[in-house]
Design a protein with these regions (language model features):
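Gram-negative/organellar outer-membrane beta-barrel architecture
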Residues: 410-429, 437, 441-454, 464, ...
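Buried hydrophobic packing residues in well-ordered domains
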Residues: 50, 80, 96, 190, ...
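Patatin-like phospholipase
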Residues: 10-77, 85-399, 403-411, 446, ...
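C-terminal segment of classical bacterial N-terminal signal peptides
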Residues: 2-9
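Acidic/histidine-enriched alpha-helical segments
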Residues: 256, 326-341, 396, 439-446, ...
Length: 907
């Protein structure tokens, strides 16, 4: 109970002081001054799980908020824990509604484990692009995944929402404005574990972790998963906190009724949990004083397509029952004093002249008052006063009501916080409802919260009111610094050194923490590829209230470093091929990788031993080296065109082989994560040969020992190497090979490739690409440019021609591709392609001419299968050629129609 600090006047011994019945639960929101609150029953809400159906709980909270029905306690499970946790840390129902409508639920709850391709190191992109299956080992022990996903997207989303909350806990959820409890299940013992302290976002995440789909949260020796397994509607948790009035919000919805509906693993998991929760409900519902069940009309728990309708369903049911709740939480005094016949008056602390606006409100309540406690309660319910009491003289039938109004505010001064962030006008806007006018305690609290929201919108997650002082009519608000006193790293294995971790953290502890930098730091750590989950928290340290008593904690769950990757591929040129890649991706705790990979097929074989340092220490320098062996055989033909649309299929085919082995190394600097500028060298034996029993040899072959040096720039921001829908790819390279070893002639090569992917809506992408390269007058066959076919590691894409149809010292090509990915599946997710390209190769730079261009057009379909992309394309090459002796006109000529098919990633 809060009392006025003003000295009480002296009264005759017959007079007595009567205080109103007030709420004993502490007020934990921001306020200008401590104030009395009228007595009522404490209100607790139990929020159930239910997946997407749980979104309806926001509508219930919205209805209660509009009816000014307070909530003192929340106990939540699964989605109820997420909504309840966010509500407890200061998000209003309006805030939650915006979050629910704008959050990309499908990606947040996705079981896809991979990082966005555009945000990982180039070496990691190449490794990931060519493999189909990845298997991890821990000290030669096969690590069988215990879940389909670590749920990093959900973890990161909840972390940032809690970090940007209006209030932060003191490592105890009872310190939040609404005391909070999250229910989870220990997967080992099956025990019910109620989380009441620690990281709020981790508690929400633990309570909503669907077994098998998401990785359990390890905490205090428990492996925590969805609380719906043991208590999907935790009404009994409200008994633990002694809530006087218990409301149950049941949004578990209905189960799937058809076997065909259970077509995905998460739907089966949801059905299993629904079966378990159905057994718990009768006992929990009996404990509730009121049950709110939104009309969800058999809505499925995995359907987030119509969030607005779900919120509206909860809102409608909440509005219907709000009146019942309001009446039920009222309290009546045990004994009441009749003051109807008393002489009644009132006194304001500060005098009546300074509180004239209050007079019109108070006079009516006092004049019409017939019961003492009821009148005191009505005065408090105006929310205009910090304290109210009465002095009653029963013998004289005289009563005086003493009221301490909220002080009048004429000016607002905001100090502290990060410098230059808020203008005077922005700060005053937050307090406009209280400056120079009558206001309530609730309005004052909302103004302070609006000030905090303004800082949150500007990206300052930890700035909050540190001191609020009323000096005369001047309100002085001192904001905290928004800084942390340190960064703590918590690892589950401690297998990674601090340098690779700290270099990815972009937090400056000498300045206010920015939410964008915190998010970037967490993403950077996850994108190194050595962590399965990265979470952050910034709970306050108890007993330190100067704004700096926080530690920013990064909790890291490390992956086993040994990885075996496998790949399979089939195409019409090389037939079946097999990939095996084995490497350690965290040598000595540095995140450097060492390993090798081999590829075996009918016409090619590759073996590589690689060492890569994505970053050297805390710098952006990078190092890469590789021992390699690469051997392939290929066919070439005499490319001809015919006036007949069916074209001309040449039988004049020659077979060649190229074999290279040696060592290459590169040193350079990172350009973000997906780019690199480097100098490199290659020492190799390069042998080209004409295969026996094939057509006549038209290409010059040789065996040479070569030492080449060069420089390259590579930037790859594509979201996919196969069918990208965004991003670009750029590669520029210059190489010179001097007359060394047994190389009789020096040569050089300059080339560039660029690809730009432009989204044309949510399902269509236009890809523009171009490549050009020039060389010295002499180039060994192994170093020349190869064009033709659908594109692979050896021959650049040129639709309408066979692989390796064009081989030369100089080349130029340009193309466009239009892809459409329908919203429905054709057995698997699919994309339709329409492609065009033009270009050619030339032996001499002086021969390069637009009049010699060859064109190709094609269309195809790509399926995204579990074994990798399956591509089927039909194409046609054509050219505008002049008849012999005709220099003025040209005619359209065609090559043969070609079909391309491949299954699996290109490696």
């Amino acid at each position: 109970m809060l009392f006025s600090s003003c000295p009480l006047p002296l009264y005759a011994s017959e007079a007595s002081i009567v205080f109103p019945d007030t709420l004993s639960t502490p007020f934990k929101r921001y306020s200008l001054k401590p104030f009395m609150r009228p007595a009522r029953k404490t209100v607790g809400i139990a929020l159930s799980g239910g997946g997407a159906n749980g979104i309806a709980q926001i509508g219930v909270l919205k209805a209660l908020d509009e009816e000014r029905i307070p909530v003192d306690y929340i106990a939540g499970t699964s989605m109820g824990a997420i909504i309840g946790g966010l509500y407890s840390c200061g998000y209003s129902p309006a805030d939650l509604e915006i979050i629910a409508e704008t959050l990309p639920w499908q990606s947040v709850l996705s079981i896809r484990e991979e990082n966005p391709r555009a945000r990982i190191f180039l070496e990691q992109q190449r490794i990931r692009d060519r493999s189909t299956i990845a298997i991890r080992f821990d000290k030669l022990k096969l690590m069988i995944p215990k879940s389909l996903s670590s749920a990093q997207a959900l973890t990161g989303t909840l972390d940032l929402l809690v970090l940007n909350g209006i209030y932060h806990s003191w490592q105890d959820f009872n310190s939040l404005p609404v005391q909070f409890r999250a229910v989870s299940t220990d997967l080992i013992s099956g025990k019910r574990i109620t989380l009441t302290s620690g990281s709020l976002s981790e508690a929400m995440r633990a309570s909503s972790t669907i077994p098998v789909l998401f990785e359990p949260i390890e905490r205090d020796g428990y492996r925590l998963v969805d609380g719906g397994l043991v208590a999907n509607l935790p009404v009994d948790e409200l008994d633990v906190v002694n809530a006087s009035y218990k409301i149950a919000v049941d949004t578990h919805g209905s189960m799937y009724s058809k076997s065909g509906d259970l077509d995905l693993p998460w739907k089966a998991a949801d059905q299993a949990i629904s079966i378990l929760t159905g057994l718990q409900y009768p006992a929990q519902l009996e404990k509730a004083d009121l049950v709110i069940t939104p009309d969800l009309q058999s809505h499925n728990a995995t359907d987030f397509s119509d969030v607005k309708a779900l919120i509206e369903a909860g809102y409608k049911k909440g509005r219907v029952l709000a009146g019942t709740i309001r009446r039920s939480i009222e309290t009546r005094p045990v004994r009441e004093t009749d003051i109807g016949s008393y002489n009644k008056s009132y006194l304001f602390d500060g005098g009546e002249s300074a509180n004239r606006e209050h007079t019109g409100i108070v006079s009516g309540i006092v004049r019409n008052g017939t019961a003492l406690n009821r009148t005191l309660t009505e005065l408090l319910e105006t929310d205009l006063f910090t304290s109210v009491y009465a002095v009653i003289d029963k013998p004289k039938k005289n009563i005086v009501f003493h009221l301490t109004p909220l002080p009048r505010i004429a000016r607002i001064t905001i100090t502290g916080g990060p410098q230059g962030v808020l203008s005077i006008e922005e700060g005053e806007t937050c307090f406009r409802p209280v400056i120079g006018q009558l206001y309530t305690n609730t309005t004052a609290t909302r103004s302070l919260e609006d000030l905090v929201r303004l800082y949150r919108k500007k990206g300052y997650s930890l700035v909050e009111p540190q001191k609020v002082i009323l000096s005369g009519d001047n309100l002085q608000v001192t904001m905290s610094s928004g800084m942390v006193n340190g960064i703590e790293i918590v690892q589950n294995r401690n297998s990674i050194g601090l340098t690779p971790i700290l270099r990815e953290i972009k937090i400056d502890t000498t300045t206010a923490i920015r939410s964008g930098k915190a998010e970037e730091s967490a993403e950077n750590l996850y994108e190194t590829g050595v962590f399965s989950r990265v979470s952050l928290s910034a709970e306050k340290t108890p007993f330190i209230d100067d704004g700096s008593g926080r530690t920013l904690t990064f909790s890291l769950v490390e992956k086993p470093s040994s990885v075996l990757r496998l790949g399979l591929r089939y195409d019409e040129t090389s037939n079946a091929q097999f990939l095996l890649d084995l490497r350690n991706e965290n040598i000595g705790g540095t995140t450097s990788s060492f390993g090798g990979w081999i590829k075996a097929g009918k016409n090619n074989s590759v073996a590589n031993l690689e060492f890569a340092m994505p970053r050297i220490g805390s710098t952006h320098f990078t190092l890469f080296s590789r021992l390699f062996f690469d051997q392939r055989e290929f066919d070439t033909r005499d490319l001809r065109f015919s006036a007949d649309f069916n074209g001309y299929d040449s039988d004049d085919i020659a077979s060649y082989g190229i074999q290279r082995y040696g060592i290459t190394g590169a040193f350079g600097t990172r350009i973000r994560k997906n780019g690199r500028l480097a100098i490199d060298f290659t020492l190799q034996n390069a042998q080209s040969y004409h295969a026996t029993d094939s057509g006549p040899a038209t290409l010059r072959t040789a065996e040479l020992n070569l030492l080449s040096v060069g420089a390259s720039l590579t930037i790859d921001s594509r979201n996919s190497a196969q069918i990208p829908t965004s991003g670009s790819y750029t590669h520029l390279s210059y190489t010179v090979t001097p007359e060394l070893l047994d190389n009789d002639a020096s040569f050089w090569q300059l080339s560039g490739i660029h690809e730009e992917n432009i989204p044309l809506g949510s399902h269509t992408t236009l890809q523009l690409s171009g490549a050009a390269g020039i060389s010295g007058s002499y180039m060994p066959l192994s170093e020349q440019f190869f064009l033709g076919g659908p594109g692979n590691a050896y021959s650049r894409r040129f639709i309408g021609l066979k692989q390796n149809d064009l081989i030369g010292n100089n080349m130029a090509t340009a193309g466009l591709q239009l892809s459409y990915s329908p919203p429905f599946e054709i057995i698997f997710p699919a994309s339709f392609l329409l492609q065009y390209n033009a270009g050619n190769v030339w032996e001499k730079r002086s021969d390069m001419s637009l009049s010699r261009l060859i064109h190709g057009i094609g269309t195809g379909i790509v399926w995204n299968t579990p074994a990798g992309p399956a591509k089927l394309t039909v194409s046609k090459g054509f050219a505008f050629l002049r008849e012999e002796g005709d220099r003025e006109s040209s005619s359209l000529r065609f090559s043969d129609t070609l079909w391309y098919f491949s299954l699996g990633h290109d490696f």
